[in-house]
Regions:
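Catalytic cores of the polymerase beta-like nucleotidyltransferase superfamily
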Residues: 1-269
Length: 269
């Protein structure tokens, strides 16, 4: 069977970054894969097999063409041509292939876009964002985590279709926002998202943002919708940090009542 590593792992390999999530595209169907691989085939209807080999998480998908979208779920047909498969992906930097011998194959100019630090949609960006508005947040996430610029045509489409992100589930929004808030460029990126009007659509505001290496410490600085999907532990940690911030100083009382961890995080803010 024809198989390639594709997506973020290859992009990060080129950037000399560590990555533990591996996406493999193959000409084999899930039924064929399960004859020689053991994994979770619960997504078999989507042509996918998940394998956990700590520290790696491996997703294997059959080459496919996406025919239509319904609430982010595409109708697909399985194909045998990897060149057609990569056309369905979001950005050129995520469509570079690596074969079994470690050779890099780039049909869409992704390597040059990595060199140029450019986030560029594959094909028509208007169609890409209408099909799946999550791609808008993914573009902004890569802008934050990779410190790349967004291609002009891609940015124009983001501005045109940004309202569509309001249709996304809060869980998917949080997954992307988590990564943005933990990025080195978080302040610059959040200011950029504010300028684009993205944060207004998401119902997120802030007066001042200070980068801290703690997710709850970042969220504690934001005003968020009441239904934002935090875990109970996250909710508790955020409320504690906000309580200390409102108190206005770090003293022995804060350390005694809340512990050194919360005192240190809040002290950085």
């Amino acid at each position: 069977y024809e198989s390639y590593i594709v997506g973020g792992y290859v992009r990060d390999f080129i950037l000399n970054k560590k990555s533990y999530d591996i996406d493999i595209a193959t000409s084999a169907t899930v039924k064929e894969m399960t004859t020689f691989l053991s994994g979770n085939a619960s997504s078999a209807h989507y042509g996918a097999l998940k394998i956990s080999k700590p520290p790696y998480n491996i997703d294997i998908t059959t080459f496919r063409r996406e025919l239509s979208y319904q609430k982010r779920n595409p109708t697909v047909c399985y194909i045998k041509d990897v060149k057609e498969d990569i056309l369905r992906r979001d950005f050129t930097i995520n469509a570079i292939l690596m074969d079994k011998n470690g050779n890099i194959i780039d049909y869409l100019g992704g390597i040059q876009d990595i060199r140029d630090k450019k986030i560029k949609c594959i094909g028509n960006p208007n169609e890409k964002f209408q099909d799946d508005p999550l791609r808008i947040l993914r573009a902004l996430r890569f802008h934050a985590t990779l410190n790349f610029n967004i291609d002009s045509a891609t940015l124009t489409a983001i501005k045109k279709y940004k309202e569509l992100i309001s249709t996304l589930s809060k869980t998917r929004i949080k997954n992307e926002l988590d990564k943005i808030l933990l990025s080195e460029n978080v302040v610059k990126s959040m200011d950029y998202m504010k300028k684009l009007g993205i944060l207004k659509i998401l119902g997120i505001t802030y007066k001042k943002l200070v980068k801290v290496d703690d997710l709850c410490g970042m969220y504690a600085q934001l005003e968020l919708p009441n239904d934002f999907p935090f875990t109970k532990k996250e909710q508790s940690n955020i409320k504690t940090i906000q309580k200390i911030l409102k108190y206005g100083k770090i003293d022995n009382t804060v350390i005694y009542e809340h512990g050194l961890y919360f005192a240190m995080i809040t002290g950085l803010i």
